[in-house]
């Protein structure tokens, strides 16, 4: 199975994986509105891949099979200063 990846024009580091190029029928309208105009990143055979950069390949495959799409969002940013203060036992 081929997988097509698009990046969001509205949300940084946010990617949408779908089964077919330019086919967003399974993606909810509210998600598409938040995502913005999809920009094509790549098309690849997902069955032949063992890993992906930031996403768990098994979760991506399962989501595409069940929902027709997978949304990859960036991990939350860590406040390094607050973490350092916490490690030192200091309060904010």
From Swiss-Prot:
<protein>
    <recommendedName>
        <fullName>YcgL domain-containing protein Sputw3181_2259</fullName>
    </recommendedName>
</protein>
<feature type="domain" description="YcgL">
    <location>
        <begin position="1"/>
        <end position="85"/>
    </location>
</feature>
<dbReference type="Pfam" id="PF05166">
    <property type="entry name" value="YcgL"/>
</dbReference>
<dbReference type="InterPro" id="IPR038068">
    <property type="entry name" value="YcgL-like_sf"/>
</dbReference>
<dbReference type="InterPro" id="IPR027354">
    <property type="entry name" value="YcgL_dom"/>
</dbReference>
């Amino acid at each position: 199975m081929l997988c097509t990846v698009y990046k969001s024009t509205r949300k940084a580091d946010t990617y949408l994986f779908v089964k077919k190029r330019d086919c967003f029928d399974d993606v909810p309208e509210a998600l598409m509105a938040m995502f913005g105009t999809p920009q094509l990143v790549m098309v690849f055979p997902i069955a032949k891949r063992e890993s992906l950069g930031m996403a768990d390949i098994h979760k991506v495959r399962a989501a595409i099979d069940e929902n027709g799409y997978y949304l990859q969002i960036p991990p939350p940013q860590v406040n390094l200063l607050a973490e350092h203060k916490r490690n030192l036992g200091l309060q904010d």
